[in-house]
Amino acid sequence: MVAVGSTLPKVTLWENKPEEVVEFPSQGKFIIVGVPGAFTPPCSSQVPGYIANEKQFAAKGISGIYVVAVNDVFVTKAWKKSFDGGEQSGVHFVADWNGEFTKAFDAGFDASGLLGPLRSKRYAAVVENGKVVKVFIENEVTDVDISSADKVLSSL
């Protein structure tokens, strides 16, 4: 599983449209929020905290927040639009459509019974200069506690 000291895998991710490839910053501090699936109730309850606290995260030195879901880019774009203030926020909703990032980051689990074969575990990772410096992994993928925006923000 993703751990402190892990480096970010070099894989392709997308935002907004298939032609818009996302690259995580190589310098600075940012947060990756891994979620099992767009529009699922627990994920949809977790993400608004990151949108609402975007300025508070910036005040603590966070240059970006990237919500990564094993969904296609059209789904992640629609999901961002579904949140109050989502479209206007600087929070990135990133599609890991084939799960390549999730697998390489060792953050996947088999959700065949409900969401499909591969989904991301629920976590938040603080990344600085390309390395994970803090990680918040939920014990159960349906839980939203350890990786909540409030808990991550209070740790910074």
Swiss-Prot record:
Residues the record marks as active site: C43 (cysteine sulfenic acid (-soh) intermediate)
GO CC entries: cytoplasm; cytosol; mitochondrion; nucleus; peroxisome
Misc note = The active site is a conserved redox-active cysteine residue, the peroxidatic cysteine (C(P)), which makes the nucleophilic attack on the peroxide substrate. The peroxide oxidizes the C(P)-SH to cysteine sulfenic acid (C(P)-SOH), which then reacts with another cysteine residue, the resolving cysteine (C(R)), to form a disulfide bridge. The disulfide is subsequently reduced by an appropriate electron donor to complete the catalytic cycle. In the typical 2-Cys Prx5 family, C(R) is provided by the other dimeric subunit to form an intersubunit disulfide. Pmp20 lacks the resolving cysteine residue.
Which PANTHER family does the annotation name? PEROXIREDOXIN, PEROXISOMAL MEMBRANE ASSOCIATED PROTEIN 20
This molecule's function is given as: May act as a chaperone rather than a peroxidase. Has no thioredoxin-dependent peroxidase activity. Shows weak chaperone activity.
Q: Which gene encodes it?
A: pmp20
Annotated GO biological processes are: cell redox homeostasis; cellular response to oxidative stress; hydrogen peroxide catabolic process; protein refolding
* Top-level taxon: Eukaryota
- PROSITE patterns hit by this protein: THIOREDOXIN_2
Q: Give the UniProt subcellular location, in the record's own words.
A: Cytoplasm; Nucleus
Its assembly, as annotated, is:
Homodimer; disulfide-linked, upon oxidation.
Query: What are the recorded GO MF terms, alphabetically?
Result: peroxidase activity; unfolded protein binding
- Which keywords has UniProt assigned to this entry? Antioxidant, Cytoplasm, Disulfide bond, Nucleus, Oxidoreductase, Peroxidase, Redox-active center
Which residue ranges does the record assign to the Thioredoxin domain? 2-156
Report the family membership. Answer: Belongs to the peroxiredoxin family. Prx5 subfamily.
Per its record, how is this protein called by name? Answer: Peroxisomal membrane associated protein 20
